[in-house]
Amino acid sequence: MKKKKIIFSSLLFCAATLPVAAQNDFNYNEDSQFRPQTNRKVNTDSLGSDKEIPKGIRVWTVDERFGDTKAAVVDTLQHMYMNSTFTEGLRGEYNTLGNMGTARLNRIFIDRRNTQGNFIFTEPYDYIVNPVSDFHFTNTYSPITNITLNSCGDKVTGEDDFKAIFAVNANKRLGAGFRFDYKYGRGYYNAQSTSHFKYTMWASYLGDRYQAHLLFSTNHEKMTENGGITNDDYIKHPEIYTESFATNEIPTVLEQNWNRLDNQHIFFTHRYNVGFSRKVKMTEEEIKAKKFAMASKKENAEEEAKEEARKKAKEQGKKFDEKAYDKQQRAKFSGRPDGAKIAGDEPAKDLAAKDIRNDSTRIAVNGKAAADSLLAIQKKNAEDSLFYKSEYVPVTSFIHTVKFDNYRRIYEAYQTPADYYLKEYYDAGRLTGDSIYDQTKHWHMKNTFAIAMLEGFNKWAKAGLKAFASYDLRHYELPTMEGGFEKYNEHALSVGGQLSKQEGKTLHYNAVAEIGLTGVDAGTLAIDGNVDVNIPFLGDTLQVRGDAFFHRETPSFYYRNYHARHLWWENDLDKTIHTRIMGTLSFPKTRTKLRVAVDEIKNYTYFSQSYDITEEGLRTGVIVTPMQESGGINLLTAQLEQNFRLGILNWENQFTYQHSSKESVCLLYTSDAADE
């Protein structure tokens, strides 16, 4: 029944959006504005009431803590589009289970998220559960609809990726939209199918004094777990078997096992700006547009006046002489008629006798040339004043951001192999015996209040400054041995500040510090910073960028506490200390980018899994334990990107080298190469 509802809803959506779909070729300009190129001829309305529809879209991202906006580039059907649906990433940098929609992990350590999430089960699915900072808000000149379907394979092993986006603006300040994503991978091996649904809605209001962004998403992820194939020789040495196997015929460790994730997210940030208004000159494009509007208005007024004169002549039974009318209108602006006299009294004799040359209150105009020059200056000043606009300059902002996340994870299994798990802690709840129904819930609410002194409101304000306070409330539910649920609540209060400079062309920097005051995160410290210098070099810009952070943070709740049918732990872990220093050198002219990073981690937390393998290739005695490495781990990463282009030929290369001082704890790929 659910499947029928989904199909019906999809058909209804397609039917509703088809009338507004346009057959256009799209492109974006240097201002990140998406503009359809309509070069084909279109039949016009026979009534002559056609209106030119404005085209274009602007997108941006927002900071998850403060709601600061940053211009972004619109996604287009251009660079690397053919790889955009791959779970492996654009350049194959992720390890996956081979199927669309499976869990994944980035092989490049410096490209992984810096901090552990509160709900670790969704981290391997970051292509569905995206961070707020990656989302593109929209401002469109006219409604935008985009529907995309990528499909491959057949009914047995096929994959489908469907995406539908609609965005619209009520006016130039208020915009909204929605997006629907559906990923379905049947899998190439037994019990490997995946299914992901995601629905997103957003809205934004960008006024001079008040600004707000709202983002809502609800996700459902369902993955079939097979535990891997029973013997790697089916792949590595198929010749040792007397019969051949298709991939979906190779025996797997588990069957009828599902991992389900349901999560909802609400993000809302708004601010009130206090500042002043000032007159600034319009841009060249705005001046051209205003001149065109003024000329059009004048022309329309003249046409209306002529039409009114024509109607009046018709009512009076007279013939309308258009040439005489036009001559009369031109005469109105040709100056004073010949023989015109100046009316008024003659100046008083005492005033006439006054030496005007010695009058400091009057402007001396010597000759006709000087008078003409003065009149020209006055006319130019009057014209220039028309091309200034009022701009509101914010000085101080009062910011509030709230974020609410709700999660549920269910692991449901039937026909679990005998002795597969080492321990069993209880046999109660929804499923018993050889069946498993593990469930955990979590919700998290975070409020942040900030006061900002903004950058650039005058020539002395070279940087922006913010002070903020955040309060976290986290709720968790874990099963008990009696079949019920045990509830946990964690509170955390933190304060911090930010110093940043984003305007200008040569130097930019950003530094944020946050310290935990109370609750489970008391004593935590997070310092993040980056700086970039842009140097003109060989007709282009050489950018040198530095990034660094120091994080002392509490390990995620699920590293410290977890209850399930066959897994159970309650640990008191030390805070993890992670330091990174990274430098980046970029030169667009040679299409070169070099990154070098050094990491040091103390009290690194990870999961350790152990099991035995029988002669038949089955697993027994499976156990998972959270571990913490008290010593330090040093990591080195060096990455070179070098791209080449010759006419229509394009060759992109990325080479990465990594080294870990303790591979038994933090194992990394030593080298990784990708080329397109």
Question: Where in the sequence are the language-model features?
Answer:
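Bacterial Sec-dependent N-terminal signal peptides
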Residues: 1-27
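Terminal non-domain segments
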Residues: 4-5, 9-10, 249-251, 321, ...
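Intrinsically disordered, low-complexity segments
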Residues: 7-8, 15, 358, 364, ...
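A generic structural signal for short, non-catalytic loop/turn and secondary-structure boundary residues
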Residues: 15, 140-142, 391-393
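Membrane-proximal, glycine/serine-rich, low-complexity loop/turn segments characteristic
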Residues: 23-267, 271-323, 327-346, 351, ...
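Exposed, low-structure sequence patches enriched in small/polar residues
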Residues: 216, 252-314, 319, 368-672, ...
